[in-house]
Amino acid sequence: EDDLSDFNPKV
């Protein structure tokens, strides 16, 4: 999920 750092709607 580190790669999803660019796409984190949960944040």
From Swiss-Prot:
Could you name the domain of life of the organism this protein comes from?
Answer: Eukaryota
Q: Which GO terms describe its cellular component?
A: extracellular region
Q: What is its main location?
A: secreted
Name this protein carries in UniProt = Venom peptide Sh42
Keyword Secreted in record: yes
Q: In which tissues is it expressed?
A: Expressed by the venom gland.
- Could you confirm whether the keyword Secreted appears in this record? yes
The remark listed among the other comments is:
Negative results: does not show activity on voltage-gated sodium channels, potassium channels, and calcium channels. All the following channels have been tested at 10 uM: Kv1.1/KCNA1, Kv1.2/KCNA2, Kv1.3/KCNA3, Kv1.4/KCNA4, Kv1.5/KCNA5, Kv1.6/KCNA6, Kv2.1/KCNB1, Kv3.1/KCNC1, Kv4.2/KCND2, Kv4.3/KCND3, Shaker IR, and Kv11.1/KCNH2/ERG1, as well as Nav1.2/SCN2A, Nav1.4/SCN4A, Nav1.5/SCN5A, Nav1.6/SCN8A, Nav1.8/SCN10A, and DmNav1, and the nicotinic acetylcholine receptor alpha-7 (CHRNA7).
For this UniProt record, give its keywords in alphabetical order, as a comma-separated list. Answer: Secreted
Which family, according to UniProt? Answer: Belongs to the SA81-like family.
Q: Where in the cell is it found?
A: Secreted
